[in-house]
Amino acid sequence: MLQKPRNRGRSGGQAERDRDWSHSGNPGASRAGEDARVLRDGFAEEAPSTSRGPGGSQGSQGPSPQGARRAQAAPAVGPRSQKQLELKVSELVQFLLIKDQKKIPIKRADILKHVIGDYKDIFPDLFKRAAERLQYVFGYKLVELEPKSNTYILINTLEPVEEDAEMRGDQGTPTTGLLMIVLGLIFMKGNTIKETEAWDFLRRLGVYPTKKHLIFGDPKKLITEDFVRQRYLEYRRIPHTDPVDYEFQWGPRTNLETSKMKVLKFVAKVHNQDPKDWPAQYCEALADEENRARPQPSGPAPSS
């Protein structure tokens, strides 16, 4: 079992409830608390009480849609289920991605009209959660085009792995975000993760092995064939499993283009924590950095 970030002012019982990076395993966690996290609710059940929002400062980062206060002050509506909220966030993300393909600024009025509907009372929260998912899963940052313009665009910001033409999907769309998530899962799970566990996690982000995805196309083919062919991942059958299961490990290209420290920093950014908050992984990443700094033996000399 992996270590969660160190306790910061939490009770001893909290440590017993901690789970690994990729699995939510606390049966006592409230639905409301789980609903308030988009990407992080899949990475870990709870973050330390000093979590500051995705930007690293008190409060949230990114565009704050006009009318947020009015929306928060709107008359209360009956509680929505976890499934309803996640579907609405997924719908908003899909709407923003489709609009961005035409490179036309996205108007807040269109978002409210075509997506939000009766969810106006929680629009600020839906907007924030959609922005987080866009950034950490797809590598896009949702920004307001001009102050108080109520018009938004998506910009590509996630490039932790050296990306080339091979790293782009059929439509020329970056797949770095998905790759980094899979690499993070592998590292945080002890450098190996079962395929079934990986898909259990990715489903929570709206990425399914059997469904066509707007950005990633065929996710199963992308992960188990394309990333493997590009040598970012190793994909092996686990012996003596019934039903048959497979596992993922980092491939040699990943070790050349990125590092455990860079991937750990990506995970820490998602949690809004410091890489040192995962002592075991941080020590492993440091050792990897030291090993990389040592002079490496030269390769075989070309034959004459």
From Swiss-Prot:
Coiled coil: none annotated. Residues 1-82, 285-304 are annotated as: Disordered. Transmembrane segments: none annotated. Residues 60-80 have a biased composition (Low complexity). Pfam families: MAGE (PF01454). InterPro entries: MAGE, MAGE_WH1, MAGE_WH2, MHD_dom. Ubiquitous. Residues 85-285 form the MAGE domain. The keyword Phosphoprotein applies. Component of the SMC5-SMC6 complex, a complex involved in repair of DNA double-strand breaks by homologous recombination. The complex may promote sister chromatid homologous recombination by recruiting the SMC1-SMC3 cohesin complex to double-strand breaks. The complex is required for telomere maintenance via recombination in ALT (alternative lengthening of telomeres) cell lines and mediates sumoylation of shelterin complex (telosome) components which is proposed to lead to shelterin complex disassembly in ALT-associated PML bodies (APBs). In vitro enhances ubiquitin ligase activity of NSMCE1. It is linked to Lung disease, immunodeficiency, and chromosome breakage syndrome: An autosomal recessive chromosome breakage syndrome associated with severe, fatal lung disease in early childhood, following viral pneumonia. LICS is characterized by combined T and B-cell immunodeficiency. Some patients may have mild dysmorphic features. Component of the SMC5-SMC6 complex which consists at least of SMC5, SMC6, NSMCE2, NSMCE1, NSMCE4A or EID3 and NSMCE3. NSMCE1, NSMCE4A or EID3 and NSMCE3 probably form a subcomplex that bridges the head domains of the SMC5:SMC6 heterodimer. Interacts with PJA1. Interacts with E2F1 (via C-terminus). Interacts with NGFR (via C-terminus). Interacts with NSMCE1. Interacts with NSMCE4. Interacts with SMC6. Interacts with EID3. This is Non-structural maintenance of chromosomes element 3 homolog. It comes from Homo sapiens. The lineage of its organism: Eukaryota, Metazoa, Chordata, Craniata, Vertebrata. The gene is NSMCE3.
